[in-house]
Amino acid sequence: WNKFVDEHVMNYVSMHGWHRMVGIIARSIEGGEFEQLLENIPLPDQRKKWATARSGWSEADLAAATDKIVYALEKVEKQLGETAWLAGNAYTLADINFYSHCGMMVERMFPELEVAAKYPRLVDWRERVTARPAVAEALKSEDRTAPGLRTWSGHVR
């Protein structure tokens, strides 16, 4: 499950977040300054993401990413019909990983997917994860993210 979340779910959710939020930031930086900033990013994949965020992903790429997210939601819904938690009958890192990358905010990021109507087991699972004492405590913490970078709100500024 963790490999699936890390290599599948996170990439496609991230693409939408970068397109919606980071793209606005990247496009607001003047051309020469942006190129200079790119040179300072040590990881080639991150440089490519910033450059792509500036130009934007194609509608076809975004639609394909959404299809992959739907696949993930269907896979999770099916699994939760068989076991109480993602990796079996015990709460594990798989639950924490999926919750933090997709499960917690998927409805806010993708309202068009009608998560509550189509994935009731996932919604129940999310509520059970959210109610866990450590998760509830973490969610009460102050959000220290700069307001302009809060990608889960659906707004950049």
Go through the PLM ranges and name each one.
Residues 7-127:
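GST-like fold's C-terminal all-alpha helical module
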Residues 116-157:
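Long, positively charged, glycine-interspersed low-complexity recognition regions
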